[in-house]
Amino acid sequence: MHNPLLAKAIWQHLPETYRLRLASIDVIDCLDSTQTWLDQQLPTLQREWRLCAAVQQKAGHGRQDRVWFSGSGQVAFSWRGWVAVEPEYVGLFSLNAALAVQSALITLGVSQVQLKWPNDIYIADRKLAGMLTTVVQRRGHLCDVILGIGLNRLSIALPSEAIALEGKIARLPSVAELIAAISHQWLRRLDALSSAHGRAEIREAWLSSALWLGLPIKVWQGNQSVEGIWLGITDRGALRLATNTGEQVFMADEVKLRPLD
């Protein structure tokens, strides 16, 4: 069932200029996945975006086929739209989205937000939010993209390695405020993906808050792992690792990483 009151609240919290970039906002009380719902809809036209949020999400998409549950009071939503960007730079989508989440949290009063490659948001070395980017189709340099985000707003039923905004901020924002603030920053940052200068800014800004940068880490690729020093990321968003046999580069959809004990 659709929830027009929450959709209206998100719309009202968005700055008026950025409302023009959204073709629609759909909020549904219970969904398997906001990404799946948007994938089943017709793509938006050019620079317009569609937003789908769920009050309860039963099977959100994660990396490496993980499934995530998000209950009432948490934040689960996805965007779908066209972006003008060369296909080789699609790896920067998640990094740019992470910067949008970070900027939104800072404006809401959250400090010391850390970014974990390639698509997670951390506070105090614990996971606050994650995201997943899917390229649905391409037309030249235009990419039809679905970007899903899940954020722990409430601390109820979280695993020990996760953290929530609840108790970490003076005033806990509503779900509508959080979705609107993140959407505002995402729409504001979209154009950066289309130019070399903008992509360089994404890379520099992301590295300035990167978790474990310059430290020993272990990278898993399937059942195999490799250890090394995390050097940073390439101009396409891939991870650079200094190992005993030289530098290795890993793409975001191939690996997971952890710090060495």
Which residues does each predicted region cover?
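Long, positively charged amphipathic alpha-helical accessory segments at protein N-termini or as interdomain linkers
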Residues: 1-11, 21, 86-87, 91-113, ...
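Short loop/edge segments at beta-strand edges and connector loops
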Residues: 29, 115-117
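Conserved active-site carboxylates
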Residues: 120
